[in-house]
Swiss-Prot record:
Function: dGTPase preferentially hydrolyzes dGTP over the other canonical NTPs.
Domain of life: Bacteria
Protein name per its UniProtKB record: Deoxyguanosinetriphosphate triphosphohydrolase
InterPro entries: dGTP_triP_hydro_central_sf, dGTPase, dGTPase-like, dNTPase_1, HD/PDEase_dom, HD_domain, PHydrolase_assoc_dom
Enzyme type, top EC level: hydrolase
Keywords annotated in UniProt: Hydrolase, Magnesium
Cofactor: Mg(2+)
Similarity comment: Belongs to the dGTPase family. Type 1 subfamily.
Domain HD: 66-273
Keyword RNA-binding: no
Length: 505
């Protein structure tokens, strides 16, 4: 196995206007400080404050948004990174692993990957994703792309429909249809950072948010060796060349992951499990006492010094022992959070170190907190109680259904842009308004300038005389609509839907 040298992974160069020459430790740290500034000051991060964590359209500021959740993940990620570096230092391994001059960048990459990990999520979270994918599948029918005879293809878009005698073009059509129908928040995050926001981050920093390594256009079985790493789409066809370059710069084998991404993932797992339960109590879905009993019964067999007693039981007893200075509710979650972090962070750090050869190679085919240990069982306990008692609550389900309808409705409203012919839409893009298309002109004007420019730039580079042009133009037109709607906040999407459906009070 190749030696572990993080100097080959923590690549401080950029796609554009990259720093040149040999850099000192301080100069490299400044490059990653620049990344931090670009990320923290980006509109994509600000929009997280009005995007759903669990409870859509929530007016109670004490309940988490995507932004407050991401800040908590950032803190836990920093904690895990510091724990890893501290343990490696104690074993005199920092220099051997090429980290002695890169501890600052190591921490910074993890922190900013944690802060960015949700930036591609659409309004209303997973229900927004489902709405986008269902809407496009009902029109593009990606499953029919393998149909025989080709006349069975139900795709409603003529340029994407399979044609006899056009096998090479049909392959592209299949790829495009699959890609469009697999919108995914992590893949959209890569698209935001590179294509839409043009943040020009270092290769290492972008590698930190490439959580899944399966391209969205993938068809067929996934290799067992990468089943976990490829369980969801990680990037789109539109970013294929960029990801190929990223892999080269970070020395990543096909479908392998950047090492520090495992830390971001563990931080997210630790953070949201406790946070979702705390938000449910804040929303009065259940009381702290009811939550404790849910956790107690879901754990199963109890022993005196079990992990449950050391973490959950200890938090419950301490919160009941002193109710003078703080409420039981507040104290319980303070102790639960502290106890959980004190157990899971060192464990995650040690798992990273113990599996470092595979993690460095990018092939470790599971999460750090996904094993047969009691620590993994504790996380599963939190998740299972949330699924059974929070996500299935009628109020939560009603809001999710409303969110699904809002996103589906917005796609219906913007559908005329996708129904235009290639020539008509090209003319609309050029002139911005066409008298013979009054509705389409007004819809086009509502699209953000950033998204329109991204469409124009990529389509202008396509060879117009090629047979692929109509297929790829329509692909990027679909991306244009998806970019715009997925970039909305929950509240903006809700308000926009009500305005355009003429139900505004």
């Amino acid at each position: 196995m190749a030696s572990i040298d993080f100097r080959n992974k923590i690549n401080w160069h950029r796609r554009y206007r990259s720093p040149q020459g040999v850099k000192t430790e301080h100069e490299i740290l400044r490059i990653f400080e620049s990344d931090r500034g670009r990320i923290i000051n980006s509109p994509a991060i600000r929009r997280l404050q009005q995007k759903t964590q669990v409870f859509p359209l929530e007016r109670n500021a004490a309940v988490r948004t995507r932004l407050t959740h991401s800040m908590e993940v950032q803190q836990v990620g920093r904690y895990i990174a510091k724990e890893i570096l501290s343990r490696l230092k104690a074993q005199n391994l920092l220099e051997e692993y090429g980290l002695d001059a890169l501890t600052g960048p190591f921490e910074s990459i993890v922190e900013m990957a944690c802060l960015m990990h949700d930036i591609g999520n659409p309004p209303f979270g997973h229900f927004g994703e489902a709405a986008i994918n269902d809407w496009f599948r009902q029109r593009l029918y990606p499953e029919d792309a393998e149909s025989q005879p080709l006349t069975h293809d139900r795709c409603v878009v003529s340029s994407l429909r399979l044609q006899e005698g056009e096998e090479s073009l049909n392959d592209i059509r299949r790829k495009v249809r699959q890609d469009i129908c697999y919108f995914e928040g992590n893949a959209q995050g890569i698209r935001l950072v590179h294509t839409l926001m043009r943040m020009n981050l270092t290769w290492a920093q972008v590698g930190g948010i490439l959580k899944y390594t399966r391209p969205a256009w993938w068809r067929g079985p996934v290799p067992d060796s990468h089943r976990y790493l490829m369980k969801k789409p990680g990037y789109y066809l539109s970013e294929e060349k960029y990801i190929a370059r990223l892999r080269k710069e970070l020395q990543l084998a096909p479908y392998s992951r950047f090492p520090l991404t495992w830390i971001m993932e563990a931080a997210d797992d630790i953070s949201y499990c406790v946070a979702d339960l705390e938000d449910a109590v804040e929303k009065r879905i259940f009381s702290v006492e009811q939550l404790y009993h849910h956790l107690y019964h879901a754990w199963g067999h109890h022993e005196k010094d079990s992990l449950f007693e050391l973490v959950v039981g200890n938090a419950w007893e301490k919160s009941r022992a002193n109710t003078l200075s703080r409420s039981t509710e507040e104290q319980f979650f303070m102790y639960l959070r502290v106890n959980t972090l004190n157990k899971l962070v060192p464990y995650a750090a040690q798992r990273f170190i113990d599996n470092l050869p595979q993690i460095f190679a990018g092939t470790f085919n599971q999460a750090l907190l996904e094993d047969a240990s009691g620590f993994s069982r504790l996380l599963e306990l939190y998740k299972n109680v949330a699924v059974e008692h929070v996500f299935s609550h009628p109020d939560v389900e009603q809001l999710e259904l409303q969110g699904y309808r809002v996103i589906s409705g917005l796609l219906d409203i913007y559908q005329p842009l996708l129904s235009m012919s290639l020539n008509d839409f090209s003319e609309l893009v050029e002139k911005e308004r066409l008298k013979r298309f009054p509705i389409e002109s007004r819809l086009f004007q509502k699209l953000s300038t950033r998204h329109r420019l991204a469409y124009v730039e990529v389509v202008s580079k396509l060879p117009m005389d090629s047979a692929e042009y109509p297929v790829l133009e329509y692909y990027y037109r679909c991306r244009l609509v998806q970019d715009y709607i997925s970039g909305m906040t929950d509240l903006y999407a809700w308000d926009e839907y009500r305005r355009l459906m003429a139900v505004e009070q």
